[in-house]
A protein has these predicted regions:
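Class I S-adenosyl-L-methionine-dependent methyltransferase catalytic core
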Residues: 1-253
């Protein structure tokens, strides 16, 4: 998510003094909210990104007061977005990993080639197989129809797990973390799998509604540039529909 878009979402969907949750904070751009008198709980799975977030927090603390707002506080913790016990927030704002990766040998991913091969990722989120962005996508109808299992032994068990099943648990955790009348704002983008566009925004709406959220609004932002890997893919498959929008989905708790 771009920083200008994130700031717009912060200003539009939260107010000074609110606690904003980002359960997949990456390098911590959500910390910009602290310079706008909001408070932040930032959760990130991987240590290297936690360290980036901590470094960015130091910079925000240095330059934030110059913007003329009172500074909010931030809590940064390493953890899994599927386990958010003890968190309470007014708003959740984040961009889930949306599988915009190019893989070889992954039957469930873009660029699949052959059976039984190990995936070779050209642009993965991480080398950690438990990272949700690295899981095979899954089937939305199967996930919605299945019971929502929260047993601790299933968290992080990547065998048979899918992106959709994992994200359903994340959204359920966010639903439980939000105060009454809280909001969850997601920025998602369709992606291409097997030369077909997968409309992640539609599947995401179904996942969120299945755990209790009410869908409120949808906006989109037209993308003017493709990623490097997506540009290469487009050249190789010129007939495949271009993904040129990202969607902002707003849900009520």
């Amino acid at each position: 998510m771009s920083l200008p878009l994130q700031i717009w979402l912060i200003e539009h969907y939260s107010k000074p003094g609110d606690i904003i949750l980002d359960p997949m904070c990456g390098s911590g751009t959500i910390l910009a909210a602290c310079s706008l008198s909001r408070n932040v709980i930032a959760v990130e799975l991987e240590k290297k990104f936690v360290e980036m977030t901590e470094g960015n927090w130091k910079r925000v603390q240095e330059v934030g007061p110059e913007l003329g707002h009172s500074m909010g506080w931030a809590i940064i913790r390493q953890g899994d977005a599927r386990q958010l016990a003890g968190v309470l927030a007014d708003v959740a704002i984040f961009s889930p990993p949306y599988s915009d990766v190019i893989r070889r040998g992954n039957p469930g991913g873009p660029g699949a080639s052959g059976k039984g091969k190990q995936p070779s990722c050209l642009a993965c989120y991480s080398e950690d197989p438990s990272n949700i962005g690295n899981l095979p996508y899954g089937d939305i109808d199967v996930v919605i129809a299945s019971p929502l299992t929260e047993a601790k032994e299933n968290i992080g068990n990547t065998k048979g797990d899918t992106y959709l099943r994992a994200m359903r648990i994340v959204y359920q955790q966010c639903y439980r973390c939000l105060k009454p009348h809280g909001l969850m704002i997601l920025v998602v983008k369709p992606f291409i799998r097997n030369q077909q566009v997968i409309h992640l925004e539609r599947d995401t709406q179904k996942l969120c509604e299945s755990v209790g959220f009410t869908f409120l609004e949808e906006h989109y932002r037209r993308l003017t540039h493709m990623s490097f890997w997506r540009t290469l893919y487009a050249r190789k498959h010129p007939k495949v529909e271009r993904v040129d929008k990202e969607f902002i989905l707003v849900f009520g708790g």
